[in-house]
């Protein structure tokens, strides 16, 4: 899924162990994105991995993001993961959603 979102919040970047990454660690952060249109639009909490996790976004930034959705089962429960494959800031635009 690739579309335009508004940034609601972004966590601090931290490092987690990874067998695939050089140096054995990968950068990771979480980001909250909402579809434009109003405060009751769909919102997503997604994980950003790798170098993209070091990019800082601010509240109300407009971004184009490609999200990958997956599910996994653990101890009889099903969980959904959302990972940001790509994220780009739309420069010089801010979107204010009426509360």
What is each of the regions a protein language model found here?
Residues 1-99:
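Single-stranded nucleic acid-binding surfaces, predominantly the OB-fold ssDNA-binding core
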